[in-house]
Regions:
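Eukaryotic intrinsically disordered, low-complexity regulatory linkers and tails enriched in Ser/Thr/Pro
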Residues: 1-154
């Protein structure tokens, strides 16, 4: 997909440092040498029957696996108004908790110890599926061309 043109939250450009692909996203910054990338993927899966995970992974010759993902409640894939209202109420509660803590909880990776705590995994959560598509497009373009790129997602 070439959605970066439609999404004003995304800036994707050639990187002055030609050896690297960089991503600045809410919640952090990731940088990898293009010659260290062994594979990239974009895929989706259902998690615990409640959430569809749209995910980009970057595997490297080092010890770290990078994951960029967007979470979509399964209710959004269905036409069920009642379920959607419950999900929206849950989101409001999470947002209010984050405001009290002074943190944007929506941008934070959600983990359950120890089931989702993986050594060597770097994770970033995105809030818009278009941002994930733009990120994958930038990554793929850099890896295929061997020319560094930098993407910034607001």
């Amino acid at each position: 997909n070439n959605n970066e043109d439609e999404n004003e939250n995304v800036s994707d450009s050639s990187n002055e440092n030609r050896r690297f692909w960089e991503a600045s996203v809410p919640g952090g910054h990731y940088m990898v040498a293009l010659d260290r990338i062994s594979n990239i993927s974009i895929h989706e899966y259902a998690l615990d029957g409640a959430v569809v995970v749209h995910e980009v992974t970057i595997d490297t010759n080092g010890r770290a696996l990078a994951r960029f993902y967007y979470l979509q409640p399964i209710s959004e894939t269905m036409n069920r108004n009642e379920v959607a209202r419950v999900v929206d109420k849950g989101r409001q509660l999470i947002d209010r908790a984050g405001q009290r803590l002074g943190t944007n909880v929506a941008d934070m990776v959600q983990k359950t110890y120890p089931a989702t705590t993986h050594a060597g995994t770097i994770e970033y959560r995105l809030q818009d599926i278009r941002d994930l598509d733009a990120l994958y497009g930038s990554l793929r373009k850099a890896w295929e061309s061997g020319k560094g790129r930098k993407i910034t997602i607001q």
